[in-house]
Amino acid sequence: MHKDQEKPIKLLLTWAGSDKWYLLASVFCAFLSGLFVIGPYVGIYHLMDAVLLGTLTRKGLTDCIVLVSVTTVFRMVLLGLSGVLSHKGAYNALFRVRCMIIEKLAKVPLGYVSERSTGEIKTVLNENIEKLELCLAHNIPELVSYLTGPVVIFLYLMTVNIPLALISLIPLLLDIPVMMAVFQKMSALLPETNESLADFNSVMVEYVRGMRLIKAYRMGSKSFKKFREAILDENRAWNKIAKKTAPLYAVFILLLESGLLLLVPLGGRLFLHGSIPASVFLLFSYIGSLYLTELLPLQQLSGNFAQAFSGMNKVKEILALPTFEGGDAFPESHDIRLKGVRFSYDGKINVLENANLSIRDGEKIAVVGA
């Protein structure tokens, strides 16, 4: 498969090299951490059930406390271990990617570097690659952890009552199109944001270099029009993202937390008709309406993934540049000959055409333009 056609996650692991094993170990720890999410839910459910039925004993209370405490401790320990492993692998991978870009820039034609501002290249090396750290060290392990917990709880609910368990999934099914819409909007708006950030970095470098003149003439930031406009453009870009995605985020939260509106009426009806006992009704009223809230951070992750993939595209653009291949033997003759050279500033009108020039070894020639 061509490198440009590789899936983003696979490409990130390819760039990580041998450090990908830290990232995979981090994902495994995050998966184990997600398995322990069910502990507190089950423990508190058994405690509430025992209190309502009047069967609570000291041993039952102790068992619930131990279950909640042990599963919570194990979850936090595994989550912390996942974070350590992911950061170790992520920062090593970022170092490797930055080295790849620097080595690439050292071999590309000089025209590429001269045609791009310092701020644009700085944006790729700093901001765009830094977004990859957020993806590798946080988003991927968190995605696994956030998905594992609800899946385990859903499987547990399926063993209790299949119809009510399936009903509890309705809010999630309604939310999937919302999440996809947010990801698409972020992906469409991020190129504009990256462009404004690159312009901002370019103007910032120029502003810092001219700081002595600004102080000498007692000029403020408002008098430096390009600097002010760059700040406003960056602000406008992020305000646009907020206005486009905020309504969808509100819809996402409302739908995800609407399980109670479905489970309580339907579960209550089944309970009144004797189809389910009170403990099952309590279980779905408590756990069935809450376990999907574990997926709330996924909405933020969709935006983070969009930013990371946008940064990856910038990195891929540089890595895909053609390189200047040397390796030929040094010529014995040091003469310089230009034959039939033409040049145009705009690509349409030639300002230099059919120019021929011969400079012998050791000869000095000055070219003066009119």
Model regions and ranges:
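Cytosolic ends of transmembrane helices, especially the final helix of ABC transmembrane type-1 domains
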Residues: M219, K243, Y291-I318
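Hydrophobic alpha-helical segments in the permease module
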Residues: L67-L79, L172-I176, M180, T245-G259, ...
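ABC-type nucleotide-binding domain
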Residues: E332-A370
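Juxtamembrane helix-loop junctions of ABC transporter transmembrane domains
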Residues: F36-Y45, T71-S114, T118, K122, ...
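Membrane-integrated ABC transporters
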Residues: M1-V37, L53-C64, S82-S86, A90, ...
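Transmembrane helices of ABC transporter permease
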Residues: S18, Y22-S33, C64, V68, ...
